[in-house]
């Protein structure tokens, strides 16, 4: 019997704040809010998309595609395992990202029903995975120390 490693998708997400320090969140098909970002592309032969060379490259590309925002990946915030559906696990990686286009309204891709900007005090009441809330709280805490 040969060894077959578990293969989980890796989703790289951004905590991105606009010029008013509001965090950008996207509303998904599960009726949850989530951080923008997406899957690490492994490239051919598994698909037609070119491979991402780093997690930072992934999050920067995904933000452009999903929201139209240009960002620069900064500090790695967290990694955690999320099970959006029974038996389906995803490795989530979150980054603190600097928005290079902070005055640009976010676009909404076909993957989400809407995009909204939330103030820090609004985040705890939102329906979203706790891992995202931890990452958002970490960014706000770090920025208060600056």
Regions found by a protein language model. Give the residues of each.
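Conserved N-terminal beta-strand and adjoining loop/helix that marks the start
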Residues: 1-23, 79
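Active-site-adjacent beta-strand/loop module that shapes the phosphate/pyrophosphate-binding cleft
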Residues: 9, 80-104, 116, 139, ...
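A structural signal for short, well-ordered beta-strand segments
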Residues: 14, 76, 95-97
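Conserved hydrophobic "DFG−1" position in protein kinase catalytic cores
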Residues: 16-17, 25, 97-99, 117
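Conserved Nudix-box catalytic region and its N-terminal flanking loop in Nudix hydrolases
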Residues: 18-65
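A short coil-to-beta-strand element that immediately follows conserved catalytic motifs
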Residues: 69-79
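NUDIX/MutT-family hydrolases
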Residues: 96, 106-139
């Amino acid at each position: 019997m040969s060894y077959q490693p578990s293969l989980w998708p890796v989703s790289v997400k951004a905590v991105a704040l606009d010029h008013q320090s509001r965090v950008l969140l996207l509303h998904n098909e599960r009726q949850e809010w989530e951080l923008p970002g997406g899957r690490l592309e492994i490239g051919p032969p598994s698909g037609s998309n070119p491979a991402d060379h780093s997690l930072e490259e992934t999050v920067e590309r995904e933000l452009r595609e999903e929201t139209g925002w240009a960002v620069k990946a900064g500090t790695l915030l967290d990694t955690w395992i999320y099970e959006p559906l029974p038996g389906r696990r995803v490795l989530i990686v979150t980054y603190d990202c600097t928005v290079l286009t902070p005055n640009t309204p976010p676009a909404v891709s076909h993957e989400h029903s809407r995009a909204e900007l939330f103030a820090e005090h609004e985040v705890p009441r939102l329906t979203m995975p706790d891992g995202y809330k931890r990452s958002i709280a970490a960014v706000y805490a770090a920025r208060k120390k600056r």
